[in-house]
Amino acid sequence: VLSGVGHSARDTYEMLHKRNVEMTVKPFAIGVRIEHDQAVIDESQYGVEPSSLGLGAAEYSLVYHDKETGRTAYSFCMCPGGQVVASASENGGVVVNGMSLYARDSGVANSAIVVNVGPDDFGTHPLDGVAFQREWERKAYELGGSNFHAPAQTVGQFLGLSPAPSVQDSTY
């Protein structure tokens, strides 16, 4: 039997494990969601206002392969003209996702920026990946004020290039 439940079906994983169903550890990706002014992305991709070309809001895709570590960081689920939305499946954890509005006209682009992780990062027990996710979701919850607000910072802060002004605008 092959089960294709989603990554948030943790109660299902735990129930199957308790019933001694054979489970295999799988690598996955974990990361953050980044927001940009959509006009900056449009200019970067098209060089002009997209409507002047009869186009909608621009998308992008980024990939970086680190040959030394074997890790890959990449953009995922890029949402032009959208917003960041809450996606937590458990109390005490913060998870966010992105979505585009139908017209893709919110003026804000967002994308997940993720990195691959595997058993070397979280362990070889079948439920170690679940524990790893929960740990990071709990840390995000605490950093956001323990009220389901997502922690936020600028790219400059994330990269250690700028002091810590407060984030002025976020769709979340």
Predicted segments with their positions:
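Residues forming the flavin
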Residues: V1-Y172
